[in-house]
């Protein structure tokens, strides 16, 4: 299988992040690395998707420039193979053990799944409405089935905003794709006050 592992970043990648990517078990797959710099996150992610389509990749693994992935991230994200699978990362600046994963039952994206909730799950995966892309494996066909842009920021009249990763999740669901989160892929985050095991 041919996989593009790409980091979208405006400036650079943190050393610890690169080390975690370097140490990741490639599971015998052909894995190419790209760091797309100099763009906001939405534009960088769109460029990465286009590289995957143009390069004939089967999957794209996006890892944020401040996210520490576990060594078995790729192995678990591919077990079993799915269209969109997210790793789990702490939500920014919170002590409530929240993640940027919104439950499938929440219509307005106002709720977040917590690590305590995820710790109580019996299976390895859970379907979510939307989730952050700090660590995300996407089958390239998903991008091919979507309209461009795949990632975008949306601002609404009440001044609320839809982030680029949530936008992707909504658009992918409109194309009948499910968004899954893998409870085995617990990522660290250099910019978060709290990290959970």
Each PLM stretch: what is its role?
Residues 46-59:
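Active-site nucleotide-sugar/metal-binding loop of Leloir-type enzymes
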Residues 56-68:
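Short beta-strand-to-loop acidic/aromatic patch adjacent to the donor-nucleotide binding site
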Residues 35-37, 88, 183:
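Residue-level recognition of beta-strand->loop/alpha-helix junctions
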Residues 49, 70-154:
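Conserved catalytic core of nucleotide-sugar-dependent glycosyltransferases
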Residues 1, 141, 145-197:
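C-terminal catalytic/acceptor-binding lobe
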Residues 1-43:
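N-proximal low-complexity "stem/linker" segments adjacent to membrane-targeting elements
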Residues 42, 46, 71, 166:
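Glycine-rich phosphate-binding loop at the start of an alpha helix
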């Amino acid at each position: 299988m041919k996989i593009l592992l790409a980091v979208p970043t405006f400036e650079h990648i943190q050393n610890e992040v690169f080390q975690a990517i370097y140490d990741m078990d490639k599971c015998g797959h052909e894995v190419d690395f790209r760091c797309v710099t100099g763009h906001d996150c939405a534009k960088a992610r769109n460029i990465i998707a286009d590289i995957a389509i143009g390069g004939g990749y089967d999957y794209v693994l996006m890892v944020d420039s401040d996210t520490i992935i576990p060594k078995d991230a790729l192995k678990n994200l591919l077990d079993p193979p799915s269209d969109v699978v997210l790793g789990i990362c702490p939500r920014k600046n919170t002590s409530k053990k929240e993640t940027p994963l919104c439950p499938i039952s929440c219509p307005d994206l106002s709720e977040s799944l917590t690590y305590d909730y995820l710790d109580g799950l019996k299976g390895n995966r859970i379907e979510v409405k939307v989730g952050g892309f700090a660590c995300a494996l996407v089958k390239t066909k998903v991008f091919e089935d979507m309209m461009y842009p795949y990632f975008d920021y949306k601002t609404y009249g009440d001044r609320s905003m839809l982030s680029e990763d949530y936008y992707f999740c909504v658009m992918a669901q409109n194309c009948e794709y499910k968004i899954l989160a893998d409870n085995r892929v617990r990522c660290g985050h250099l910019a978060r006050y709290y990290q959970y095991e």
